[in-house]
């Protein structure tokens, strides 16, 4: 599958990352988490992160609220770090982009995105809505 081709070893069902128990701590599972969803899924990540682990948050697709307690931060020393893509200084962006293009570059990065022209965009949007596109679509205005 597409995800296996990217090196994925296991797909975690949403039920495992959306704890509705109300408990302030869960079984420590993760050393680190990159969250793009927010809400209770982010809280589940926080309360199931191992001692000294870190969570980054860069989105709020599910919710921008965080129904959390401070216990994971105090008892496990968990760190929550917000990723700001708006105010990030250009010199910092360039350093990170250079690393992504160099030493951090994925072997199969071409599989993550495809290009389309502006004229092809409506067709691509329809395909995305039908679930027929995997990865990202980049509009190349020069094409």
Where is each model-derived feature located?
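Adenosine-nucleotide cofactor-binding segment
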Residues: 1-40
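Terminal peptide-recognition signature
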Residues: 3, 33, 45, 80, ...
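Short beta->alpha linker loops
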Residues: 15-16, 37, 61, 91, ...
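Short acidic active-site motifs
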Residues: 20-22, 40-44, 120-124
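Short SAM/SAH-binding signature in class I
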Residues: 30-34, 53-54, 136
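Glycine-rich phosphate-binding loop and adjacent beta-alpha segment
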Residues: 40-106
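C-terminal hydrophobic helical "lid"/dimerization subdomain
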Residues: 94-143
């Amino acid at each position: 599958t597409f995800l296996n081709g990217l090196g994925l070893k296991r797909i975690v069902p949403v039920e495992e990352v959306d704890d509705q128990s109300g408990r302030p701590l869960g079984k420590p599972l993760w050393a680190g988490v990159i969250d793009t969803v927010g809400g209770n899924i982010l809280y589940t990540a926080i309360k199931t992160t191992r001692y000294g682990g870190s969570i980054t948050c860069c989105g709020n697709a599910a919710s921008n609220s965080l129904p959390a307690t401070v216990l994971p931060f105090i008892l496990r020393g968990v760190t929550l770090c917000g990723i700001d893509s708006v105010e990030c200084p250009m010199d910092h962006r360039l350093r990170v982009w250079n690393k992504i293009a160099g030493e951090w570059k994925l072997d199969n990065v071409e599989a993550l995105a495809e290009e389309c022209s502006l004229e092809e965009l409506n067709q691509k949007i329809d395909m995305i809505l039908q679930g027929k596109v995997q990865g990202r679509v980049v509009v190349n205005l020069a094409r």
